[in-house]
Amino acid sequence: MNVRFQNALKRIPQAVPPVWFMRQAGRYHKHYQALRAKHSFMEMCKDPKLAAEVAMGPIEDFDFDVAILFSDLLFPLEAMGMGLKYDPAPQLGWHLTEENLKDLKRWDEAKPALEFQKQAVIETRKRLPESKSLIGFVGGPLTLFTYAVEGAHKGGLEKSKRSLPLFKPFCEILLPLLKENIQLQLEGGAEIVMLFDTAAGELSPRVYLENVVPALKELAQAFPKKLGYYAKGVLPAHLRDELFGEDSLFAGLGFDHRWDLRDAFRDHRGGFVQ
């Protein structure tokens, strides 16, 4: 467990913040490139020992404070029966519609397909020094919905926005599986699990608060103080909900270069993860 990382989650002032690689290993890291030359991306994710080797690269080369599970946020969609390959970008076998929503596998059938992530966390934790922390991650509900509907996250997400009435019934199937996915990673030794919601900023604050926040609350209530949350491109108006306030159930929030850190410190009294 890394002291600097724990201090950041507890909002304890410190001279040096914790450092970790946002992109797991870093696509431009020579250690990653050498492994990628020998193995497919899918193989690197699904072989627990390989995934641990990738995750350890930044720790061994730069002595960072925190490692993060090497994986991909789309694996829950694969587990739900949507198919997945990388050629080189991710490609799903089919896209979500009102007609095929019923074809998605439920959590009890899908969960075994995510067991490899728990094993990858276990292998990474074995290799990490005790002074380092370990983060797991899953995709945020809206981001997974976007990929399910469109097959990619690009542009203004017009198709996802038109399909927003599908979001709630999709979450009724997705969230039980995400809870199992998060639990697997925590059981494997992750200190917290990040929710990466890279599509969230494409929605207006009103639409985000009305549709996305209820799904986030369900996850946060299931794992109080065990989840971090980063939503790309959101504005202060997106986070005007008690979920992001002083008594937030999240372990910490992530903020990017679009934010004035003075606003983040003023409006959000909980911990910080990035």
PLM feature spans:
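Short glycine/proline- and acidic residue-enriched helix-loop micro-motifs
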Residues: 37-40, 99-109, 161-167
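Active-site loop segments of alpha/beta catalytic cores
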Residues: 113-274
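Short, flexible, mixed-charge acidic loops at enzyme active sites
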Residues: 82-95, 147-158
